[in-house]
Amino acid sequence: MKRTLIVVDVQNDFCEGGSLAVAGGADVAFGIAEVLKRWTDGEPWDRRYDYVVATRDHHIDPGGHFSDHPDYVDSWPPHCVAGTDGVAFHPNLDPQPFDAVFDKGEYQAAYSGFEGKSHDGVPLADWLRGHEVGSVDVVGIATDHCVRATALDAAHNGLETTVLLDLTAGVAMETTAAALEAMRAVGVRLQGEPIVR
């Protein structure tokens, strides 16, 4: 059984200074980069992961997902718009040794990385199956939105799923606590504590 690290939405617009910033996002990007450095520098026989993939919000025209008067539940300020700097991975996330990147939300709201497709059109679930992945660790932004949705979908797809909470940032205490409970309820393993400021 192969193991994969899924890096969720560590993008400029979700880090400090971005249009939908999550406090602690830049620190999470740096922490994930440290894991990626150890992975790329490690001996092939001593690597913790067989693959590392990333997801990105990549909005072209997501309809009602964007609003000038967002409710921050179903509608949000414009963010991660294709062709802008906001869609790029945060500079603290270096290196970026991704085996594949899965873009989501081009024309509709999308939270889970499992709603994304690689540049050659392969959905994340199919990519993982094709690479014989049975176990995933999930990290990224935000604990209470896209990390939660990705972890839940990973579990629903039969993957042994762990969220490395020290490498996640949540929007708010209340929604992060609810996300942790939802993930526990479907058997997702939780390690560490999320950043929530």
How should each PLM-predicted stretch be described?
Residues 1-105, 160-163, 171-197:
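Active-site acidic carboxylates
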Residues 19, 76-77, 111-112, 137-138, ...:
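Short, contiguous strand/loop micro-motifs
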Residues 29, 121-125, 148:
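Short, well-ordered alpha-helical scaffold segments within catalytic/effector domains
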Residues 35-36, 145-156:
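Histidine-anchored nucleotide/phosphate-binding helix
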Residues 46, 83-84, 88-141:
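Internal catalytic-core helix/loop-beta-alpha segment
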Residues 61-64, 110-111, 147:
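Short catalytic/ligand-binding loop motif for oxyanion handling, primarily in non-cytosolic enzymes
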Residues 107, 142-145, 168-170:
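Short Gly/Pro-enriched loop/turn and capping motifs at secondary-structure junctions
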Residues 125-138, 151-172:
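Long, low-complexity, intrinsically disordered polar/charged segments
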